[in-house]
Amino acid sequence: MKEYLENVRCVAPLIHNITNYVTANDVANVLLACGASPIMADEEAEVEEITAHCMGLNLNLGTLNQKKIPAMQKAGKMANKLGHVVVLDPVGVGASSFRKQTAEQLLKEVRFDAIRGNISEIKTLASLCGTQEKNSGNMAVSDTMDVEKITDKSDHCGKITGIDGSGRGVDADNADTVTEENLAQHISNAKMLSKKLQTIVAITGAIDLVTDGSSCYVLSLIHISEPTRPEP
C-alpha cells in the first residue's frame, strides 16, 4: 500500500469526478491528501475533453439527474477508449427505478475497473446483472470461504433476476448486513458479480469485502472467529 501511495504522489494524476454535491468537497480533499489532483466537471459539452486530460474517472450516482446521465456515458466511453481507470460508486441505486435504469445502462456501455458500494447497493447491481443468488439458508463459513490476498469486458447485464437489495435511501438495509453467519454467501455473490463484470468489487460496511472474482479480502471492524476446517 505504501508503494502505491508513493506512486500516486510521484505521478500526481488528474482525476475527473462526476460526483454528487453532498460529498464533492470531501472527494476533492481526499484526492489532494493522496497526492492526486481533482477536477469536478459534469457539463456534457466538455466531459470528453476533460476526461482526455485526466488519468482516471470517478462516477457517483448520489445526486443523479437527467443532465448527468449523458455526461457520465460520454466520459466513461472516452475513459475506456483512452485506457483510463474508471470507478463507479452506485449511491442509492436501489432507491428508485430511475437509478436502477441508469446503473444498468452505464454497466452496459462503460467498462469499470472497480465498483464500490454498500451491501444493498451491490446486491441491487447483482440483481440487475442476474448474479444474485437466492438465499438458501445460512452457509457454513468453513465450507466455502476463500479469503486471501488478491493475486491474480461486452454486454454485461441480463434481465433483472434474483433478490434486489434496495436499501434505505443511500444507506444499506439492516436486513442486508454482512455478518459472520452470512459472510460466505456474500463473498460468493460478490465474486460472481466481479467475474460477470470483470471488475474489482468493494463492499463497505462494518465488514468490508474486496474481491477480484478469484480471491477476496475481508476487512473487519468487528472480531470474526477463525473458520474451522472439517475433518478429512
Task: Label each PLM-derived region with a short phrase.
Residues G62, V91-V93, S120, A206:
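Active-site beta-loop-alpha junctions enriched in small/polar residues
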Residues M1-L88:
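Conserved N-terminal subdomain of the carbohydrate kinase-like
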